[in-house]
């Protein structure tokens, strides 16, 4: 396909139009008084949202040059979302500001490479200062504040804070859609995996259709059990102790399963069989996790162990096990604290090394089951449209909270970016030429989030920015109440990681944009020609 090439000013101005179209659609959502954007969906109801990255991903422009500009800024939002999980609108606003200011200078004759150096130096100084002024999250109230600011909802803030308190920082918090109108928190204590009983005859509570085992022994193996003779010596030892047994195996079937069911129905012996969770190497790792948590041992041929020679000392133990049709939950395993901590350290090391998102998710789940627990926030709403919007906001709030726990918090409402203004200004004083110009471009961009938050609140942004520069560090404008307050004390805070990622990613893409000198795009194909004239064929009169 033939290509169209545009150079220098022509290329950059068309791409800038795309940047502006996307950024202008996204930035109206910024701040406590930001508006929503409605996104058309081919199927189902439209999506109403104020989530920057969701809006950015939906925008496709007809002009290929404008579309390239828009996609570059969408990349800023997407990367910020990937790293910090929130702050995508702030990142978009910063990118637009750096690009616009930078292009003015490039058009006036400045060298884009020098400007890029200045931008990099300014951002490095800003990030160092951000790290200095951030402080760690110290209590549940601060976690609630971060979540409430992100979701613009105090109730959501409290729910997320409670979830994090109950499952710990390593716990897994998932967000699901509820069938009701209210948003609720459901916490699963202990280790849960998604495998249920092998036979419904094993249930002990017929009303709830679940098997509850108090103080059971737990047999953990990666073998398939079909012959009861394989486990008979072990079963006899457990029967002598008068305690129930949970069997976790690759499968329990045939004669072995029938014998367990018959003994359960006769009241001779209470045993519940479940399939081992996961597949392949992940199954081995999860069985090892269960063994460490319960103080048992995985009976596997890889370790030279078999079921016939195993004795009661190889079995794990727990205070309680609850097995439903779909899930098994082990509560209060008796595994040693040192062994569990060592295993947690091992999983954390694997988490740090892996690059696969899927592997990260599975490792995080395993970590949560060992270290904390699993909390589920069930989101309720009156309509499907409201449910989707609310779920997106809660996901952002949860990501914000995790980011705050990781790297601490700074003053919110764009105040932190102006608090680093003086540190960046010092860099501009020590530089000259185009490098100094690059630093000044970042200085101007640091004002933009505060300006936009004020504009969205119906105020004159420039007046707010000017006053904020004169205020002492920590004092900011609370757009929700229209008051000048100490932002930390008022609970208007942002995660330092979110602010850092937004600035870093915006500057990275904007600097690349400014050094662009040529843009190549496909030439659109002309509309297809109509059918040829078929009149008079075969001696017939022409078609009318």
UniProtKB/Swiss-Prot annotation:
Any GO molecular function: ATP binding
EC number(s) per entry: 5.6.1.7
UniProt keywords, alphabetically: ATP-binding, Chaperone, Cytoplasm, Isomerase, Nucleotide-binding
Enzyme class name: isomerase
Function according to Swiss-Prot or TrEMBL: Together with its co-chaperonin GroES, plays an essential role in assisting protein folding. The GroEL-GroES system forms a nano-cage that allows encapsulation of the non-native substrate proteins and provides a physical environment optimized to promote and accelerate protein folding.
GO process terms (BP): protein refolding
UniProt family annotation: Belongs to the chaperonin (HSP60) family.
One GO cellular component term: cytoplasm
Disulfide bonds: none
Main location (coarse class): cytoplasm
HAMAP family: CH60
Residues involved in ATP binding: 29-32, 86-90, 413, 478-480, 494
Protein name: Chaperonin GroEL
Subunit and partners: Forms a cylinder of 14 subunits composed of two heptameric rings stacked back-to-back. Interacts with the co-chaperonin GroES.
Keyword Ribosomal protein tagged: no
InterPro entries, per the entry: Chaperonin_Cpn60_CS (IPR018370), Cpn60/GroEL (IPR001844), Cpn60/GroEL/TCP-1 (IPR002423), GroEL-like_apical_dom_sf (IPR027409), GROEL-like_equatorial_sf (IPR027413), TCP-1-like_intermed_sf (IPR027410)
Superkingdom in the source lineage: Bacteria
PANTHER family, A to Z: 60 KDA HEAT SHOCK PROTEIN, MITOCHONDRIAL
Catalytic reaction equation(s): ATP + H2O + a folded polypeptide = ADP + phosphate + an unfolded polypeptide
Subcellular localization, as worded in the UniProt entry: Cytoplasm
């Amino acid at each position: 396909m033939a290509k169209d090439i545009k150079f220098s000013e022509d290329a950059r101005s068309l791409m800038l139009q795309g940047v502006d179209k996307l950024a202008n659609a996204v930035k109206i959502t910024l701040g406590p008084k930001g508006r929503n954007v409605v996104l058309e969906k081919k199927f189902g109801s439209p999506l109403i949202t104020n989530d920057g990255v969701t809006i950015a991903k939906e925008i496709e422009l007809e002009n290929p040059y404008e579309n390239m500009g828009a996609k570059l800024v969408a990349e800023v939002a997407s990367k910020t979302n990937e790293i910090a999980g929130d702050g995508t609108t702030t990142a978009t606003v910063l990118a637009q500001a750096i690009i616009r200011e930078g292009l003015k200078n490039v058009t006036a004759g400045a060298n884009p490479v020098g400007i890029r150096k200045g931008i990099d130096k300014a951002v490095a100084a800003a990030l160092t200062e951000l790290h200095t002024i951030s402080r760690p999250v110290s209590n549940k109230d601060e976690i609630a504040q971060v979540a409430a600011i992100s979701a613009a909802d105090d109730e959501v803030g409290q729910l997320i804070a409670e979830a994090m308190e109950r499952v710990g920082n390593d716990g897994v918090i998932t967000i699901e859609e509820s069938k009701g109108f209210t948003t609720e928190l459901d916490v699963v204590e202990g280790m849960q995996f998604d495998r249920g009983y092998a036979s419904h005859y094993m249930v002990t509570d017929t009303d709830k259709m679940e098997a509850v085992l108090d103080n059971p022994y737990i047999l953990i193996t990666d073998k398939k059990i079909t012959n009861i003779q394989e486990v008979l010596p072990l079963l006899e030892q457990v029967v002598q102790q008068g305690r129930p047994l949970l069997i976790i195996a690759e499968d329990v079937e045939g004669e072995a399963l029938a014998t367990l069911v018959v003994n359960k129905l006769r009241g001779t012996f209470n045993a519940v069989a479940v399939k081992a969770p996961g597949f392949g190497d992940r199954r081995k790792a999860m069985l090892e996790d269960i063994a460490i948590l319960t103080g048992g041992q995985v009976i596997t041929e890889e370790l030279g162990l078999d079921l016939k020679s195993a004795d009661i000392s190889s079995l794990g133990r727990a205070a309680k096990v609850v097995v439903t049709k779909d899930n098994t939950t082990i509560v209060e395993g008796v595994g040693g604290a040192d062994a569990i901590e060592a295993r947690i350290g091992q999983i954390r090391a694997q988490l740090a090394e892996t690059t696969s998102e899927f592997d990260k998710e599975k490792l995080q789940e395993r970590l949560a089951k060992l270290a904390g627990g699993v909390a589920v926030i069930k989101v309720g709403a009156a309509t499907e449209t409201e449910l989707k919007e609310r779920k997106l906001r809660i996901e952002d709030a949860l990501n914000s909270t995790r980011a705050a726990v990781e790297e601490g918090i700074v003053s919110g409402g764009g105040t932190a970016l102006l608090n680093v203004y003086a540190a960046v200004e010092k860099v501009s004083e020590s530089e000259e030429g185009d490098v100094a110009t690059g630093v000044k471009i970042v200085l101007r961009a640091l004002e933009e989030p505060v300006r936009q938050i004020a504009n969205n609140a119906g105020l004159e942004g420039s007046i707010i920015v000017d006053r904020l520069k004169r205020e002492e560090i920590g004092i900011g404008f609370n757009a929700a109440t229209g008051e000048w307050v100490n932002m930390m004390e008022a609970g208007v805070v942002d995660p330092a990681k979110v602010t850092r990622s937004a600035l870093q990613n915006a500057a990275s893409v904007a600097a690349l944009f400014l050094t662009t000198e040529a843009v190549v795009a496909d030439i659109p194909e002309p509309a297809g020609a109509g059918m040829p004239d078929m009149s008079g064929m075969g001696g017939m009169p022409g078609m009318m």
